[in-house]
């Protein structure tokens, strides 16, 4: 009567891509790192949250470093060697993620800050008074 669900696991095919772009998005709460090819197709990604950090630990530089090590391991399985790095956001994991990518053996050809700056757009959140 009922169809059986397809339980076949989709294998990730090994692409052989030598160079790509690492997008490091570091917010106040989390750090996500996505490695794409030159056209923008995602090769590998990771974040501090997917590495098991919860709550305020996700926003630490160490969590960003662990996420960068994980995504670099995944990207090197596809044969990636050189990276351009685009860093966005105001968070604390920017520099540590960049250092972890360099320490993983990638040749970093360029580093760009692509943080969006509003031309008087949305009203910002209120200042914290501690």
Curated annotation (Swiss-Prot):
Extract the GO molecular function terms from the UniProt entry: rRNA binding; structural constituent of ribosome
Q: Domain of life of the organism in this record?
A: Bacteria
Q: GO cellular component annotations, sorted alphabetically? A: ribonucleoprotein complex; ribosome
Keywords annotated in UniProt? Ribonucleoprotein, Ribosomal protein, RNA-binding, rRNA-binding
Matches recorded under InterPro entries: Ribosomal_uS11, Ribosomal_uS11_bac-type, Ribosomal_uS11_sf
Q: Which GO terms describe its biological process?
A: translation
Disulphide bonds annotated for this chain are: none
Q: Spell out the Pfam families in the cross-references.
A: Ribosomal_S11
Spell out the SUPFAM superfamilies in the cross-references. Answer: Translational machinery components
Q: Does the keyword Ribosomal protein apply?
A: yes
Q: Which family does it belong to?
A: Belongs to the universal ribosomal protein uS11 family.
**Assembly mode:** Part of the 30S ribosomal subunit. Interacts with proteins S7 and S18. Binds to IF-3.
Q: What does this protein do?
A: Located on the platform of the 30S subunit, it bridges several disparate RNA helices of the 16S rRNA. Forms part of the Shine-Dalgarno cleft in the 70S ribosome.
Q: What is this protein called?
A: Small ribosomal subunit protein uS11
What organism is this sequence from?
Answer: Nitrobacter hamburgensis (strain DSM 10229 / NCIMB 13809 / X14)
Encoding gene per record: rpsK
């Amino acid at each position: 009567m009922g169809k059986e669900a397809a339980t076949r696991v989709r294998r990730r095919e090994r692409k052989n891509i030598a160079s790509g772009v690492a997008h490091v998005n570091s917010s106040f709460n989390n750090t996500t790192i996505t490695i794409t090819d030159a056209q923008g197709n995602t090769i590998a990604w990771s974040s501090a949250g997917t590495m098991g950090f919860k709550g305020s630990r996700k926003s630490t530089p160490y969590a960003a470093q662990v996420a960068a090590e994980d995504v670099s391991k995944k990207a090197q399985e596809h044969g990636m060697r050189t990276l351009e790095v685009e860093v966005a956001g105001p968070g604390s994991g920017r520099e540590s993620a960049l250092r972890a990518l360099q320490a993983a053996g990638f040749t970093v050809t360029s580093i760009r800050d692509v943080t969006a700056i509003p031309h008087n757009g949305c009203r910002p959140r209120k200042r914290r008074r501690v």
